[in-house]
């Protein structure tokens, strides 16, 4: 019962934060010097008399509700106030994410394919990164001060210091230009109409180089963090006691020390998973992948602010869900942290 109350309380906090962030983001995008009504009539400007154009412009502004204050427009956009044209609630909370002025489609139709691609590449990048950094960090902590540990520390510092776009350019030159192992860009074999697993492997092949870049870019920080957490855990008194009692080293490391190191590592893992959604903006543009990051940059360049705002809200929801998962994970992995307390 206490767990349920805690979860409900946390969800209530997240809903409050969601509304605050969404209002701030809506106000921020409304400060951008752009007029949707004028943009919509721009193609007709030369064919209309100035007075006719101005009358149509004012009528369209009134029809679109642009003459209302920002609070009224936010409530209408969110779905808390009735739409001016239909008289019904038809906003974000009802599933209406707006209309893309550039693609001439509903925002939902525009963002569905890129969302799938972004989630696909980020999940695989997370699996690869964790599969390398956790064993590597544990091994370096156990063999602290050894040659391999010293080499890894130097290597991770170098990797951590290099911006992700530099890593991407270097890897493109090595693996795509020199070795020709992977394609430079794209999301599938041109002209191919694969289905099933063949389509999956073809897509994975084209995503391989971006995945390698994202994984390599994460090795430095994550490996050092896991190593540091494990060194702290191995220095605890109960670990020394377990070793003094003759407990097997593998049991000491993986059953006792790793469990204590897991709490800060969980924060890192989930936080990093959320950060690569924003980091994928660079990767998707570098490799010309049809993902949320590339779509977001395109929306800003094309002054498609309803689309950009919807993408920003997607990142907000992902971050809030991640924060909830972190809080709930603490009580699951560490007996010292209990939700009912």
Where are these regions (language model features)?
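Residue-level signal for discrete positions within transmembrane alpha-helices
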Residues: 14, 114, 118, 154-161, ...
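N-terminal Sec/SRP start-transfer signal
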Residues: 1-13, 244-245
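Membrane-water interface segments at the C-terminal ends of transmembrane alpha-helices
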Residues: 27-31, 155-185, 213-219
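Hydrophobic alpha-helical transmembrane segments of membrane transport/permease proteins
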Residues: 18-75, 179-200
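Membrane-interface helix starts
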Residues: 8, 12-16, 70, 308
């Amino acid at each position: 019962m206490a767990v349920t109350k805690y979860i409900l309380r946390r969800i209530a906090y997240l809903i409050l934060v969601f509304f605050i962030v969404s209002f701030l983001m809506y106000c921020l995008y409304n400060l951008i010097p752009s007029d949707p009504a004028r943009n919509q009539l721009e193609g007709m400007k030369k064919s209309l008399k100035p007075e006719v154009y101005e009358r149509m412009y004012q009528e369209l502004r009134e029809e679109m509700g642009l003459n209302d204050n920002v609070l009224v427009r936010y409530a209408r956009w969110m779905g808390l106030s009735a739409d001016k044209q239909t008289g019904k609630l038809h906003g974000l909370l009802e599933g209406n994410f707006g209309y893309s002025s550039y693609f001439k489609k509903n925002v939902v139709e525009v963002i569905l394919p890129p969302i799938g691609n972004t989630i696909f590449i980020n999940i695989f990048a997370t699996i690869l990164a964790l599969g390398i950094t956790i064993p590597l960090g544990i091994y370096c902590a156990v063999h602290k001060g050894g040659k391999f540990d010293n080499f890894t520390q130097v290597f991770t510092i170098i990797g951590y210091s290099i911006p992700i776009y530099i890593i991407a350019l270097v890897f493109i030159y090595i693996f795509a230009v020199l070795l020709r192992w992977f394609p430079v860009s794209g999301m599938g074999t041109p002209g191919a109409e694969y289905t099933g697993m063949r389509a999956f492997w073809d897509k994975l092949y084209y995503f391989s180089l971006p995945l390698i870049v994202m994984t390599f870019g994460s090795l430095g920080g994550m490996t050092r963090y896991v190593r540091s957490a494990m060194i702290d855990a191995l220095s605890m008194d109960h670990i020394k006691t377990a070793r003094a009692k003759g407990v097997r080293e593998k049991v000491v490391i993986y059953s006792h020390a790793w469990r204590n190191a897991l709490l800060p590592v969980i924060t890192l893992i989930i936080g990093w998973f959320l950060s690569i959604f924003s980091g994928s903006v660079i990767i998707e543009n570098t490799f010309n992948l049809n993902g949320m990051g590339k779509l977001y940059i395109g929306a800003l360049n094309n002054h498609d602010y309803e689309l950009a705002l919807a993408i920003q809200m997607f990142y907000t929801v992902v971050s809030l869900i991640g924060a909830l998962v972190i809080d709930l994970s603490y009580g699951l992995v560490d007996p010292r942290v209990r939700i009912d307390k």
